[in-house]
Protein backbone atom coordinates (compact mmCIF):
# COMPACT_ATOMS: atom_id res chain seq x y z
CA UNK A 1 0.00 0.00 0.00
CA UNK A 2 1.37 3.42 -0.96
CA UNK A 3 1.44 6.10 1.71
CA UNK A 4 -0.95 8.90 0.67
CA UNK A 5 1.31 11.44 2.41
CA UNK A 6 4.81 10.67 1.12
CA UNK A 7 4.21 7.98 -1.54
CA UNK A 8 6.47 5.41 0.13
CA UNK A 9 5.71 1.75 -0.58
CA UNK A 10 6.28 0.35 2.90
CA UNK A 11 3.41 0.54 5.37
CA UNK A 12 2.40 -1.69 8.22
CA UNK A 13 -1.05 -2.60 9.48
CA UNK A 14 -1.64 -1.45 13.05
CA UNK A 15 -5.26 -2.57 13.45
CA UNK A 16 -7.86 -4.49 11.40
CA UNK A 17 -11.59 -4.64 12.09
CA UNK A 18 -14.66 -5.91 10.29
CA UNK A 19 -17.19 -3.19 9.47
CA UNK A 20 -20.38 -2.88 7.40
CA UNK A 21 -21.83 -6.06 8.89
CA UNK A 22 -18.70 -8.03 8.04
CA UNK A 23 -18.68 -7.05 4.36
CA UNK A 24 -15.71 -4.72 4.70
CA UNK A 25 -12.35 -4.65 6.50
CA UNK A 26 -11.15 -1.39 8.02
CA UNK A 27 -7.38 -1.18 8.48
CA UNK A 28 -5.30 1.43 10.30
CA UNK A 29 -1.92 1.67 8.66
CA UNK A 30 1.32 3.44 9.46
CA UNK A 31 3.90 4.55 6.92
CA UNK A 32 7.34 3.20 7.79
CA UNK A 33 9.02 6.14 6.01
CA UNK A 34 7.20 9.22 7.37
CA UNK A 35 5.30 7.75 10.35
CA UNK A 36 1.90 9.12 9.23
CA UNK A 37 -1.16 6.99 9.92
CA UNK A 38 -4.13 6.48 7.62
CA UNK A 39 -7.18 4.27 7.23
CA UNK A 40 -8.04 1.96 4.34
CA UNK A 41 -11.18 -0.05 3.62
CA UNK A 42 -11.23 -3.34 1.73
CA UNK A 43 -14.24 -4.94 0.08
CA UNK A 44 -14.50 -7.99 -2.10
CA UNK A 45 -15.20 -7.28 -5.75
CA UNK A 46 -18.19 -9.44 -6.54
CA UNK A 47 -18.89 -9.93 -10.21
CA UNK A 48 -22.40 -10.83 -11.26
CA UNK A 49 -22.79 -13.52 -13.93
CA UNK A 50 -23.65 -12.47 -17.48
CA UNK A 51 -27.10 -13.36 -18.75
CA UNK A 52 -27.66 -15.63 -21.74
CA UNK A 53 -30.85 -14.46 -23.43
CA UNK A 54 -33.24 -16.86 -25.20
CA UNK A 55 -31.85 -15.81 -28.59
CA UNK A 56 -28.35 -16.78 -27.43
CA UNK A 57 -27.08 -13.22 -27.05
CA UNK A 58 -25.27 -12.29 -23.87
CA UNK A 59 -25.57 -9.18 -21.77
CA UNK A 60 -24.30 -8.04 -18.39
CA UNK A 61 -26.55 -8.29 -15.34
CA UNK A 62 -28.34 -4.95 -14.91
CA UNK A 63 -29.57 -4.30 -11.37
CA UNK A 64 -31.50 -1.22 -12.50
CA UNK A 65 -33.41 -3.28 -15.07
CA UNK A 66 -34.18 -5.90 -12.39
CA UNK A 67 -35.41 -3.21 -9.99
CA UNK A 68 -37.54 -1.53 -12.69
CA UNK A 69 -39.22 -4.81 -13.63
CA UNK A 70 -40.00 -5.65 -10.03
CA UNK A 71 -41.23 -2.10 -9.34
CA UNK A 72 -43.53 -2.33 -12.36
CA UNK A 73 -45.07 -5.53 -10.97
CA UNK A 74 -45.34 -3.99 -7.49
CA UNK A 75 -46.88 -0.72 -8.69
CA UNK A 76 -49.63 0.47 -6.29
CA UNK A 77 -49.06 -2.56 -4.05
CA UNK A 78 -48.39 -2.29 -0.28
CA UNK A 79 -44.73 -3.37 -0.38
CA UNK A 80 -42.06 -1.16 1.18
CA UNK A 81 -38.90 -0.10 -0.61
CA UNK A 82 -36.94 -1.90 2.11
CA UNK A 83 -38.63 -5.22 1.35
CA UNK A 84 -38.08 -4.71 -2.39
CA UNK A 85 -34.38 -3.95 -1.84
CA UNK A 86 -34.05 -7.00 0.42
CA UNK A 87 -35.59 -9.16 -2.33
CA UNK A 88 -33.18 -7.71 -4.91
CA UNK A 89 -30.28 -8.40 -2.54
CA UNK A 90 -31.47 -11.98 -2.10
CA UNK A 91 -31.69 -12.48 -5.88
CA UNK A 92 -28.17 -11.08 -6.37
CA UNK A 93 -26.86 -13.32 -3.59
CA UNK A 94 -28.43 -16.38 -5.23
CA UNK A 95 -26.94 -15.46 -8.62
CA UNK A 96 -23.45 -15.05 -7.14
CA UNK A 97 -23.85 -18.29 -5.18
CA UNK A 98 -24.18 -20.23 -8.44
CA UNK A 99 -20.48 -19.61 -9.02
CA UNK A 100 -21.18 -19.40 -12.74
CA UNK A 101 -19.81 -16.73 -15.07
CA UNK A 102 -22.93 -16.96 -17.23
CA UNK A 103 -26.49 -18.05 -16.50
CA UNK A 104 -29.60 -18.33 -18.62
CA UNK A 105 -31.95 -15.38 -18.25
CA UNK A 106 -34.65 -17.92 -17.42
CA UNK A 107 -32.88 -18.61 -14.09
CA UNK A 108 -33.10 -14.92 -13.20
CA UNK A 109 -36.77 -14.82 -14.20
CA UNK A 110 -37.57 -17.76 -11.93
CA UNK A 111 -35.71 -16.13 -9.02
CA UNK A 112 -37.66 -12.91 -9.55
CA UNK A 113 -40.97 -14.79 -9.59
CA UNK A 114 -40.08 -16.63 -6.38
CA UNK A 115 -39.23 -13.36 -4.61
CA UNK A 116 -42.36 -11.61 -5.91
CA UNK A 117 -44.50 -14.52 -4.76
CA UNK A 118 -43.12 -14.00 -1.23
CA UNK A 119 -43.63 -10.23 -1.40
CA UNK A 120 -47.07 -9.92 -2.97
CA UNK A 121 -49.20 -12.44 -4.86
CA UNK A 122 -50.81 -9.81 -7.10
CA UNK A 123 -47.37 -8.56 -8.16
CA UNK A 124 -46.36 -12.17 -8.76
CA UNK A 125 -49.35 -12.74 -11.09
CA UNK A 126 -48.61 -9.47 -12.92
CA UNK A 127 -44.99 -10.46 -13.50
CA UNK A 128 -45.80 -14.08 -14.36
CA UNK A 129 -48.41 -13.01 -16.92
CA UNK A 130 -45.79 -11.06 -18.86
CA UNK A 131 -42.87 -13.39 -18.21
CA UNK A 132 -44.76 -16.55 -19.16
CA UNK A 133 -46.70 -14.75 -21.90
CA UNK A 134 -50.21 -15.64 -20.77
CA UNK A 135 -52.46 -15.72 -23.85
CA UNK A 136 -55.93 -15.83 -22.31
CA UNK A 137 -57.98 -15.70 -19.14
CA UNK A 138 -57.64 -19.46 -18.58
CA UNK A 139 -53.88 -19.16 -18.14
CA UNK A 140 -54.43 -16.48 -15.49
CA UNK A 141 -57.04 -18.65 -13.78
CA UNK A 142 -54.76 -21.71 -13.78
CA UNK A 143 -51.88 -19.75 -12.27
CA UNK A 144 -54.13 -18.21 -9.60
CA UNK A 145 -55.55 -21.64 -8.74
CA UNK A 146 -52.05 -23.11 -8.53
CA UNK A 147 -51.04 -20.23 -6.26
CA UNK A 148 -54.09 -20.81 -4.04
CA UNK A 149 -53.21 -24.52 -3.67
CA UNK A 150 -49.57 -23.88 -2.68
CA UNK A 151 -48.74 -23.16 0.94
CA UNK A 152 -47.54 -19.59 1.52
CA UNK A 153 -43.76 -19.21 1.06
CA UNK A 154 -41.86 -16.97 3.44
From Swiss-Prot:
UniProt-listed PROSITE patterns: ATP_CONE
Free-text comment on the cofactor: Binds 1 zinc ion.
Co-factor(s): Zn(2+)
Pfam family, one: Zn_ribbon_NrdR
A GO molecular-function descriptor: double-stranded DNA binding
Matches recorded under InterPro entries: ATP-cone_dom, NrdR-like_N, RNR_NrdR-like
Keywords carried by this UniProt record: ATP-binding, DNA-binding, Metal-binding, Nucleotide-binding, Repressor, Transcription, Transcription regulation, Zinc, Zinc-finger
Span of domain ATP-cone: 49-139
Biological process annotations from GO: negative regulation of DNA-templated transcription
Known role: Negatively regulates transcription of bacterial ribonucleotide reductase nrd genes and operons by binding to NrdR-boxes.
Similarity section: Belongs to the NrdR family.
Protein name as catalogued: Transcriptional repressor NrdR
Originating species: Pseudomonas aeruginosa (strain ATCC 15692 / DSM 22644 / CIP 104116 / JCM 14847 / LMG 12228 / 1C / PRS 101 / PAO1)
Amino acid sequence: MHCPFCGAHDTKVIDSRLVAEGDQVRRRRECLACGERFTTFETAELVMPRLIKQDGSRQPFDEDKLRAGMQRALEKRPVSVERLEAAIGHIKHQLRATGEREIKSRVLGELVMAELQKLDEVAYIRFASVYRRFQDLNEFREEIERLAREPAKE
